[in-house]
A protein has these predicted regions:
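Start-transfer (signal-anchor) and selected internal transmembrane alpha helices
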Residues: 1-13
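Hydrophobic, aromatic-rich alpha-helical transmembrane segments
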Residues: 1-4, 76-80, 129-137, 155, ...
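Active-site lumenal/periplasmic loops and adjacent helix-entry segments of GT-C-fold
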Residues: 12-113, 122-144, 167-172
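Hydrophobic transmembrane alpha-helices
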Residues: 90, 94, 98, 144-152, ...
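Membrane-interfacial segments
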Residues: 97-105, 154, 189-194
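Membrane-interface transmembrane helices that cradle and orient dolichyl/undecaprenyl
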Residues: 138-157, 190-193
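Membrane-interface alpha helices of multi-pass inner-membrane proteins
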Residues: 147-149, 157-171, 180-181, 204
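Perimembrane helix-loop-helix junctions
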Residues: 176-204
Length: 204
């Protein structure tokens, strides 16, 4: 419960710092497509929407399908999903911080510095957290848990969360998969314990 309350506190602080958006930013590439899909005849002159729907399958297909049936046209419902995914993301990073920091206050400060002081400090706006519900937020929430389980050397949940992240945003899952696999191989080669490499999970 303490981790949940701490994650909720982080969410409240980040909301004050970054705000919350609906129908703007990257959501402008998703919501019109969903609306046009459910209301034939709308956005007929919009080349992006027409091309998106005509393409059938793309990197947002899974997220698009889920959001369509999870209340995309209800702002309050979209905010609830944003809240849940954000809290899950923060909890994962609190768990990661706990692997190297024993004091709860220092764990909180370490994670808070990532999501508050580190905002807009990455290359190409590739943030860990987004102030709107988009595929990258959902994928990075799952990928953060994958990273935690990888650090704990629990490879079954690691690969499960990676697969989920990959379905939600392929590049997020693929990038973390490559990084963790290479890191595992390098570490185990150095330690001369190649037999303990989780080949079955990697192949799956």
């Amino acid at each position: 419960w303490l981790d949940i309350l701490t994650a909720l506190l982080l969410y409240a602080i980040v909301l004050v710092y970054q705000g919350y958006q609906y129908g703007q930013g990257d959501q402008s590439q998703i919501l019109p497509c969903l609306y046009a899909q459910d209301h034939p005849g709308t956005y007929t002159d919009d080349h992006y929407v027409s091309s998106y729907l005509a393409g059938k399958v793309n990197e947002r297909t899974i997220f698009h399908f889920l959001l369509r049936y999870l209340g995309y046209n209800q702002p309050w419902m979209v905010w609830i999903w944003h809240l849940l995914l954000s809290v899950s993301l923060f909890m994962a990073w609190l768990k990661i911080a706990s692997l190297g920091i024993t004091h709860k206050v220092y764990q909180f400060l370490a994670v808070a510095s990532i999501f508050i002081l580190g905002f807009l400090s990455s290359v190409g706006s590739n943030e860990l957290y987004y102030n709107m519900l988009i595929p990258s937020l959902a994928a990075k929430s799952m990928a953060s848990w994958a990273l935690y389980f990888w650090l704990k050397e629990k490879y079954t949940p690691w690969i499960v969360f990676l697969v989920i992240a990959g379905y939600l945003q392929p590049l997020v899952g693929l990038q973390l998969f490559i990084i963790t696999v290479i890191s595992s191989v390098v570490q185990l080669v150095i330690q001369k314990k190649s037999k303990s490499i989780p080949w079955r999970s990697i192949i799956v």
